[in-house]
Amino acid sequence: MKHISYRTGNPALNSKAFASESNNRRGAEMLEVMTIKGTVDKTAMGLFLLVFSAYYTFSPDMTHFIPIGVIGGLIVAIITIFKKEWSPITVPIYAILEGLALGSISYIFNASYDGIVVQAIGLTIAILASLLLAYRSGIIKATENFKLGVFAATGGIFLLYLASFIMSFFGASISVLDPTNSSLMSIGISIFIVVIASANLVIDFDFIEEGAEKGAPKYMEWYSAFGLLVTLIWLYLEILKLLAKTRNR
């Protein structure tokens, strides 16, 4: 989301996923296998469900859906990671729940910064398209060193998120993560996070390609789509925060 040691910053996507799932399909030669086209189709379906539910909650009266979407999405994500064969059921549910949260969050940002949501969506699509083109043309390759670097950076970022979450219980926060903080350091950190989130897309592409090459079970199309959705949601939210910071300068 050819490689003996696979690393990715996305916890949902790693080589162990394919190793275990390939073992599961041994002796079941008639089982349909994962394809790139199938994964693209599943990703498109997931994005449709996400956008549809986000559109529904893009309203000032729907902010109560944020905790429902965030907590529900987290629970379903954990289930999906440990029960990959359930992906055809859990991933659509995950997309809907995340959409409920994203719609309300997007409305809050757009109410403060008019047009910011359209800009964030446009940038997310542009980054996805350009990186996919660069990956397919061989300009960018997911080498082992690349994966290791992205994995380390992603781990550091999520430790920062975790520290900020824990500090919030004590009335404190990490100011550079605040979207209202328009300092150069805060903007610089946001740019770094957007770059790392974007780099995770390259690893996701590699994961999908590897799964198709190894003949992973058909349900891994949904699981791979799940990993890509996780990265795209993260990237979109970070772009929203970055744009908000630049608007405050």
List the predicted regions and their residue ranges.
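A hydrophobic alpha-helical transmembrane-helix feature that marks the membrane cores
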Residues: M1-R249
